[in-house]
Structure formats: C-alpha cells, structure tokens
Amino acid sequence: MLWENTEHSASEATLQYTMEPKAYENRFLPYDVLTNLAHVTMLHRQGFLDDGELAALRNALTDLYHEADEVEGEDVHTFVEERVTQRTEAGKRMHLARSRNDQVFVDTRLFMKDAAIDLAHRILDFADALRTFAEGKNVLIPGYTHQQQAMPSSTGLWASSYVDALIDDLKSLRATYRIVDANPLGAAASYGTSLDIDRDLTTELLGFSQKQHNPIYCSNRGKQELQLLQTLDLVMLDVQKFAEDVINFSEDQQFFELADDYTTGSSIMPQKRNPDILELARAKAEEVSAGKEAVRRIIGKLPSGYNRDSQQTKGHLIEGVDTVRATLDILTPLVESMELSDDFEVDAGIFAAYTANQLVTEGMPFRDAYHEVKSSGEYETHDEVAEPVHQPFGDLRAFWADEREAFDAMSERLLTAD
C-alpha cells in the first residue's frame, strides 16, 4: 500500500474488503497508463521533471502498456506506479500534483468514452441489420393493439420502428458522451492542488473536448456513470421489446423463423427450438436496469466531495457495458439470419378501419360508416404493403466514426511521442 508506514497500516481483512476485484482493475490498466503519460508530460512542461526523467518515465509507461495485461497488488494505480518505479527512480515523482481520486475519475472517463464509442458502433450495426431486414423482407402482416390483430402493417414497418428507436438511443448516447467528455484530472483529492499545473494541457493530450472546471464536482463521482447507464437502459428497453416481439411473432403468430444457430433444444422434447437468446436478452435488460438503479442509490445520499461509497459504481458500470455489448453482438446476426414464414393467417378484421374509410370516400359520415362496418362484419381487403420508414442517421454514423478516429489517435500520440 502506498500510504502505509510503521505508524499506520491496515489489517489483511480490511485490505481485502476495500480492494477492487482484479477483473475490474485490469480493464482500467490501459487508460491508467495513458493518463500517466499525459500527466508526466504536463509535469515536465511545468518544470517539475527534467528531460531525462520524462524520457525514463515515458519508456517505462509505454513498455507497461504493451507488456502488462493483469494488475497485481492493491489496484491499477498502485500497480502502475510501483512497476514504473522499479524501472526508474523518477517513478517516485509521478504522483506529484495528483490524488488517487482524480486518477480514478480520469481513468473512468476514458473508459466511458471508449465504451460509448464502441457501443454506438454496435448499435449502428444492429440498426443496419434491422433496416436491411425491413427493406428486403417486407410483407403484409397484422399490426397489433391490446395484443389483438388490429390493422394492416408490414414486417418492414415493424422492423424499421426499431431502427427509429435505436436512432433515438444513439442521440441520447451522443448527449451523454458530450457530458462525459470533460477532463477531471487536476481535481486531486477534491480541492485542486497548490502546485502550478496545466489542466488545459492534459485536457488536450487526453483528447477531451473540455476540462471539468470545479474540482468538487469532479469528485462527486457517479453522476456521469449513472447517465451512461441510463442511456444503456434505454437501449436495453428497446432490446427487451424487440425480443418479446420476435418470440411472439416466431412462436404464436408464425411470421418469422429463427435460424437453428440462434435457438436451443430440449432435453426431453425432440421437436423444440427454443428462443433462449431472446429470453435471456429480456432478462439481461433487467440486469442493466438494476445496475443503473444501484448506482443511483449508491450516490444519492452522499455529501459533496469524495466518498469511498462511489467505488461501488465501477462494477455496475463495467457489467452494464459488457452486457449491452454482448447482447448487441448476438442479436445483430440473429436478425441477419431471420427468415419470413409463409405459414401464417391474417384476420380479415384488420381491414375494418380501411373499409370504413372507403365508405367515407363515397360520402358516408365516418360515424355512420363505423357502425355500418361493425354491424355487417364485411370487410374490403387489399394487398398493399406498408413501406419501412425511419429517421435518417447518417450524421450519427459520421459523429461516432470521427470520435473513434480521434480516440485512437489520442492513444497513438501519447504512446509514440518523443
């Protein structure tokens, strides 16, 4: 432990209880190296490190980035500092003008930026799969209200409704990303530092669009994590509804046929082709929502400034990101392989409103036409298929492509700078 000495140490039980799971710490290792590279570059610029010390620190950090993939010891921050110090005495200067707190904050922001960009591209892939299905496999099916056949619809109109929903999710993710895209490094323990540091420089080096101005607000950890989880909860809300629809439309209504690759069998019933993926997606949506709610409750009653309670948000954040990523990765090829069935029936009653409208075009008042159709039970049908329709999203595709390019370029610059 970096803080331990002969006068103050903690029991093994205390240390074990307060340490983060290693799997979580491993995820933050590359981001911690990048933030250290930016920090020591700034310290050198401000005169706290000489040229030789900066070179030694840069060499040690870049080697660690490429060689280490598993954290040992207390946490990722201690691991990086100790490994660098084993290589060079300058490692003892690396923590100057910085707290463990703002190390955590800035690493988490980079993790969230990277995750948001990655998930946005997966959402786009899912939307593309649905759009392709909507345009290429569009047939007349009934539309439902109150879980009853109600009016004419189409597979294309249905699938493109989820494209529309995912575009809104991408807009929400972009708004969240712009809030997350602020540099908290320099907040130190919650109140800044008396040393002359350059927060604008670290903001530029780490590719943030702005710095987080108030150090206390930087330390009120959890709000940005909550905002990202809220957005992911919206994505999974759409996933949940989609899964329910496909289960119903492939089992009860027989509109769709799922490929064998995306179903499972029964240990006792040979005929079964179970939609386990879709059922698990419904459940995993609840897990993401529960993680969001847990973060809300963890941070909800904390006073301002840093509190260790907020450490517990990390696991919910990582698990939420991983769950959404895995779900999108399996649903996209499921949609790509989904076929239309030719073994379903359409109740002629779905044309009731259309029949009433036809009578209106012939001069009958709508209410009279309504009652005429209701009492006669006779319907005029048609075979027109509703076209897919959704809002455009080329600007969102371009935005996320630009952000991926910028994030990767930031990493490359820090790792290869002279």
Task: Please give the residue ranges for each predicted region.
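A helix-coil-helix interface module used to build multimeric assemblies
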Residues: 1-192, 197-203, 265, 278-280, ...
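Charged, flexible cofactor/metal-binding loops and thiol motifs
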Residues: 109-124, 135, 141-142, 148-301, ...
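Short amphipathic alpha-helical segments at helix boundaries and their inter-helical linkers
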Residues: 62-75, 224-228, 376-392
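Generic alpha-helical secondary-structure signal
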Residues: 56-57, 205, 358, 372
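Glycine-rich cofactor/substrate-binding loops
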Residues: 1-35, 90, 269-418
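A structural signal for small-residue-enriched, beta-sheet-centric alpha/beta enzyme cores
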Residues: 100, 212-216, 348, 356
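Charged/polar positions within long, soluble alpha-helices
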Residues: 41, 45, 66, 85, ...
